[in-house]
Amino acid sequence: VQDFAFIDRIPGRKILLKGNHDYWWTTAAKFYKFCEENGFSNQFILNNNCYYYENVAITGTRGWFFEEDAALGSHNDKIFKRELIRLETSLKAAGEAKEIYCFLHYPPRYRGYQCREILDLFQKYGVKLCCYGHLHGDSHRLALEGEFEGVLYRLAAADYINFTPIRLL
């Protein structure tokens, strides 16, 4: 609750998405109920939707990361396919936005791994910026920062940005 209270006190609307440790937040309804019960009024989630800020569509989903869990096979494949559907639903919701920013928890490209399906969706919908997290500690040095295939990538993991929000617009 303290973390959400801190976030709520920051001026402006906050748009959040689920990470790999957010087991308590199983549905959007549970998240919004939690916010209501705690008096948090300016926190929203990316969940099969998008939000607009001026001419920018803010899209995204958790994503998925195969490299570490390849042995899990079909379980991973089911989750991955669901995340692709969620991402495309969010990107479609952007409509004719002038610019599309996409937020993922997992990196779509890391070390020798790249998620071609996600990268192809970025191309199909004209994503200009992708912010992602998940990488911590020594893995920062292998993160994709900068442009790749016309998309600007930014690592926004909390410890990488020194627990300080970064301005994107």
Model-derived segments and spans:
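Active-site environment of divalent metal-dependent phosphoester hydrolases
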Residues: 1, 20-28, 50-52, 65-69, ...
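N-terminal active-site segment of His-dependent metallophosphoesterases
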Residues: 1-13, 22-23, 82-99, 168
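Core catalytic region of metal-dependent phosphoesterases/phosphodiesterases
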Residues: 1-53, 114-127, 149-151, 155-157
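Short secondary-structure transition/capping segments
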Residues: 6-10, 33-40, 61-72, 131-152
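Arginine residue identity/basic-tract feature
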Residues: 9, 13, 62, 82, ...
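Divalent metal-coordination and catalytic microenvironments
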Residues: 14, 19, 58, 87, ...
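Conserved catalytic scaffold of divalent metal-dependent phosphoesterases
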Residues: 27-117, 121
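Short, basic/aromatic-enriched C-terminal tail that caps enzymatic domains
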Residues: 151-169
